[in-house]
Each structure stands twice: as C-alpha cells, then as structure tokens.
Amino acid sequence: TKQFDLAMIAITPGGWYDWNDRSILDGSPKMNDLRPLLDKARAAGMGLIGMKAGRFLAGRKWLGWGNPDVFNKYYDRPLLEAKLSEFQRSYAFVLEHGLDAVNADMQTMQHLTENFTAAATSADYFADQIANTA
C-alpha cells in the first residue's frame, strides 16, 4: 500500500505469537510457511522487525516461566548442534527467515554479546538453505 515503511510483528520460529495466552497462536503456520508473505512485504519496501522471538522461551514467573526447547522442532540439525543458546537460535532463525531485525531482551552485557553473536552469524547456519532458494 506504500502507507507503511516498517512493521513490528509478533512472530516466532513456530509462527505468530498469541498475545492472549503468551504462546504460539493456535493454527498459525510455522515461520517457514509464512516466508512468502514476509518476502512480499519486504519486496513492497516494508522493513520487518520481529517481536517476541524469545519471550515464549523465557516466559514470566506468573505464567509458569518458559519453555527453552519449544522451538527445537522447527530447527534443522546444524542449528540445533550450533554452540548457541536457545535465544540465539531463535534470533538467528527469524533473521534468516524473512525479518530485517529482531527486538531482543537485553538486561546484561552478556545478553548484548549473545544477541550480537546471533545476529552476526545467523547466515552461517542457513547457508545451504539460502543457496537452495537463490
């Protein structure tokens, strides 16, 4: 529509994030299946920033904490075997599957270092997939 230049979307490797129950939206396509939609938005000139890519992993005390393995079923073996934290895996995945940036929670310098590493090396874990789609 050329009315918007940027969208901040609630998305995870498992698909859309459900704000109501703080999990993956029931019936949501997984992020791989959302890629054509994300590519269409980017081709129209819209930047996409991912929100909540790590929230479901960490959770909150009043929600029963998180589930650090929840996205593992969406990852291939090289990503699962990479020396990355569960948060780094999630950020790397969403960055290489249609997003321009990810809004990541950072409360310590260690978080900043981990998040930078995930962003800077994300393409390394998906080189084969990228080569096959080019």
Where are these predicted regions, by residue range?
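Structured C-terminal cap/extension of enzyme domains
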Residues: Q3, M8, G15-A134
